[in-house]
A protein has these predicted regions:
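Generic structural signal for residues in well-ordered beta-strands
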Residues: 29-31, 108
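Extreme N-terminal starter segment of soluble prokaryotic enzymes
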Residues: 2-6
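An anion/phosphate-binding loop that grips the pyrophosphate of nucleotide cofactors and donors
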Residues: 41
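Pocket-forming structural segment of enzyme catalytic cores
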Residues: 90-126
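Catalytic-core regions built around general acid/base machinery
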Residues: 63-74
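Catalytic nucleophile loop
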Residues: 44-47, 72-90
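Glycine/threonine-rich flexible loop motifs
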Residues: 53-62, 90-93
């Protein structure tokens, strides 16, 4: 099986952090916004850092939604990271009225403030 993993560049996201992480484990990442390259990819990664509404707007503007949906329905390996995963749902509390890709039924919901939120981020060790 090929070590090549195609990372979708839609103008937002942590592209180069993901690219470096994949390289560190021996993968061969390809960063692209070219629909033809994405269509031919064996494995696809949709990264994400940003706001749900802005990301969906960028995907629409870039014309990548059809090739993403075709890839998802084809059954080839597809990984959404963080916001990239959230975009696969029908919508998000973060952007009321903005439709997601709708591959998964449901909406990304905001965690209630009385729930304990897991720690995310980096800590400095000495």
């Amino acid at each position: 099986m090929s070590k090549k993993i195609t990372i979708i560049d839609y103008g937002m996201g942590n592209l180069y952090s993901v690219q470096n992480a994949l390289r560190s484990i021996g993968a061969e990442p390809v960063v692209t916004s070219d629909a033809a390259v994405i269509a031919q990819a064996e494995k696809i990664l949709l990264p994400g850092v940003g706001a749900f509404g802005d990301c969906m707007a960028n995907l629409e503007k870039s014309g990548l939604i059809p090739v993403i949906m075709d890839s998802l329905h084809s059954g080839k390996p597809f990984l959404g990271i963080c916001l990239g995963m959230q975009l696969l749902f029908e919508g998000s509390d973060e952007a009321p009225g903005v439709k997601g890709l709708g591959f998964f039924k449901g909406k990304v919901r905001l965690l209630r403030t009385e729930l304990k939120i897991p720690h995310m981020g980096w800590n400095k060790l000495e």
